[in-house]
Curated annotation (Swiss-Prot):
Its EC number is 3.2.1.99. Residues 1-16 form the signal peptide. It is found in: Secreted. This is Probable arabinan endo-1,5-alpha-L-arabinosidase C. Transmembrane segments: none annotated. It comes from Aspergillus clavatus (strain ATCC 1007 / CBS 513.65 / DSM 816 / NCTC 3887 / NRRL 1 / QM 1276 / 107).
């Protein structure tokens, strides 16, 4: 009986997370950016690759259709990777949609975050504005990819970072350019284990600012499995300020390897990450991400779009 009890408890723990919401149609994605159009509520899903893939649907569950690319000719930023853009992040301000993207190559710190704008989110409607001025070189303590925008009052900030010294933030002059003289400051750092953090996404709820980020090995699962727990997963910290002071549920600083687990591998879901938060028209907060569905395949080309409505307890989110 004791052995059966242990097995039951193990299985219960392994299935502590809700499965992703339903998805039909073109459900592939990688480092997704999701937005709901203001005019009609239609959903647009953007993904890493080429000039940033665009899919759309009338419902989160789909069916999702492939609509083309944001920048089919690539970015005007003259760096390796200008035709293979990463990590779209979107917001809407004063009648315009802004999309941040990253230009880089795997393992390189020669990186830049660019921005494009549209009034409709549709393919063919986007204007590339090139670099925001948020750039890095091998001499930088950070890597300027995975940009994420947030506004606090009349100030705008861009969160960014991947590996190296992890996650940083810098103030923007507007939605297009970094503020003159602004210096990036560190938001989060993991000194433990394999150390990797990236894909910052910050949002506000009930007087708290929440910093979500992805940790662990992001890809290559078709070649080799990382050690258990070292695959991609999603963590969260919170603060009463958008510019720092983030701690996890145990009060451990995000600058000192803190971070409470929000979503990890479970069931057929492996390596969830590249996440963001969507506030839909019903004011519900939805966590979205990519994951490897072990029933389909482990390669990047097999990644799937995942989403879950967040649950809340004591102002901490769960899935």
């Amino acid at each position: 009986m004791f052995v059966y009890t242990l097995i039951f408890l193990f299985l219960a723990a392994a299935n502590a997370y809700s499965n992703p919401g339903p998805c039909s149609g073109n459900c592939w994605t990688h480092d997704p950016g999701l937005y709901q159009r203001k005019s009609d509520g239609k959903y647009f899903l953007f993904a890493t690759g080429g000039g940033i893939h665009i899919s759309s649907a009338d419902d989160l569950a789909g069916p999702w259709t492939d609509d083309g690319f944001v920048l089919p000719d690539g970015s005007s930023i003259d760096l390796d990777g200008q035709n293979n853009l990463w990590a779209p992040d979107l917001h809407y301000r004063d009648g315009t949609y802004y999309l941040y993207y990253s230009v880089s190559a795997l393992g390189s710190q020669n990186s830049a975050i660019g921005v494009a704008t549209s009034e409709t989110l549709e393919a063919g409607s986007w204007t590339d504005h090139g670099s925001t001025g948020v750039t890095s070189t091998p001499n930088s303590p950070y890597n300027t990819i995975d940009g994420n925008w947030i506004a606090v009052g009349d100030k705008q900030y861009l969160n960014f970072g991947s590996y190296w010294q992890n996650l940083f933030q810098v103030e923007l002059a507007d939605g297009l350019k970094v503020k003159e003289g602004a210096t990036p400051h560190q938001l989060s750092y993991n000194a433990s284990g394999i150390h990797r953090q990236e894909a910052a996404f910050m949002f506000e709820r009930n007087s708290y600012f929440y910093l979500t980020f992805s940790g662990g090995v992001a890809l290559g699962y078709n070649a080799t499995w990382p050690a258990q727990g070292e695959e991609y997963h999603i963590n969260v910290c919170r603060s009463t300020s958008a510019t720092g002071g983030f701690v996890d549920k145990n009060g451990v600083s995000c600058l000192n390897s803190g971070g409470s687990l929000l979503l990890a591998s479970h069931g057929f879901v492996y390596g969830p990450g590249g996440q963001g938060i969507l506030e839909d028209r019903n004011k519900e907060l939805v966590l979205y991400y990519h994951y490897a569905d072990t029933r389909i395949g482990k390669a990047v080309e097999d990644y799937q779009f995942g989403w879950n409505q967040l649950k809340w307890e004591n102002d901490w989110p769960s899935v």
